[in-house]
Each structure stands twice: as C-alpha cells, then as structure tokens.
C-alpha cells in the first residue's frame, strides 16, 4: 500500500453500504466533492478514457474505473471468478461485479498523495494491459 487510500472513508463506505442496501460501494476521485492529489495528467487522461470505454461497452455507471478502492461483501467478492493478476484487475472487478448483478453505490473521496515513493504503474505498458483486459472481457460475455 502506498498510503494514498485514506482510511477515514471506511466508516463512510460501511454507512453507505447499509443505507443504500448495496453489495459494493466504490470510491470515486472524479465529481463533486472528489479529487486526487496523486494523479498525473497522463493517469488522469488514461482513467477518463478507460472509464468511458467501461460506460459504453460494459454499461458501467462508475466515474472512476481505475480507482480500486471499494467495500464489498466478502461472500459476494468470493463468488467472482477473477482472471487477472495485474492492473487489469482494476477493470475486471467492476465489469464482473456488474455481470454478476451486484448492486453498487458510490462515494466521493480525495485520494491522498502517496507517501511511499514513486508510483508502481507504468502508464503506457499497464494501460495496454488494461485495454487488453477490457477487450478480453468484452468478448468473454
């Protein structure tokens, strides 16, 4: 963990999960009351592109497909058969959650500046892996 996910949101996740009676609550860095102190221009643009692809091809309602900060019921999470062990998991989880008819809601969050060194993501290389993962998932309906 790089410290960019603020644990202050855990209580909000839990309250939202119970209030909305959903199975997943996603944190979002884009929209009213949200933001990121860790995004670069390249990662921001890439995330916007992948989010749009997710909305168009997978009918996702997320505004932040690559922000893998969420709360999900453990039994529901374990029902999903995950394939990817790289950054493609960021898109695999919401796509497969939707395909498994898991209900979801969202909370705005502020992503903190990481305190543990440099980002592990290699924007172009990992972006290609994520796009490849989305293509595989699209054809594996």
Task: Please tell me what each predicted stretch does.
Residues 1-4:
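The conserved acidic donor/metal-binding loop of glycosyltransferases
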Residues 7-87, 113-135:
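Acceptor/aglycone-binding surface of glycosyltransferases and processive sugar-polymer synthases
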Residues 9, 89-96:
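Short active-site alpha-helical segment characteristic of glycosyltransferases
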Residues 67, 90, 101:
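Functionally engaged cysteine thiol sites
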């Amino acid at each position: 963990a790089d410290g960019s996910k603020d644990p202050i949101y855990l209580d909000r996740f839990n309250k939202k999960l119970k209030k909305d009676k959903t199975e997943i609550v996603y944190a979002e860095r884009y929209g009213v009351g949200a933001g990121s102190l860790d995004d670069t221009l390249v990662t921001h643009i890439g995330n916007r592109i992948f989010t749009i692809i997710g909305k168009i091809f997978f009918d996702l309602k997320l505004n932040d497909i690559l922000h893998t900060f969420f709360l999900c019921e453990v039994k529901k999470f374990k029902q999903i058969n995950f394939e990817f062990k790289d950054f493609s998991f960021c898109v695999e989880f919401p796509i497969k959650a939707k395909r498994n008819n898991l209900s979801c809601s969202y909370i705005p969050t502020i992503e903190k500046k990481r305190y543990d060194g440099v980002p592990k993501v290699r924007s172009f290389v990992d972006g290609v892996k994520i796009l490849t993962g989305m293509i595989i998932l699209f054809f594996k309906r």
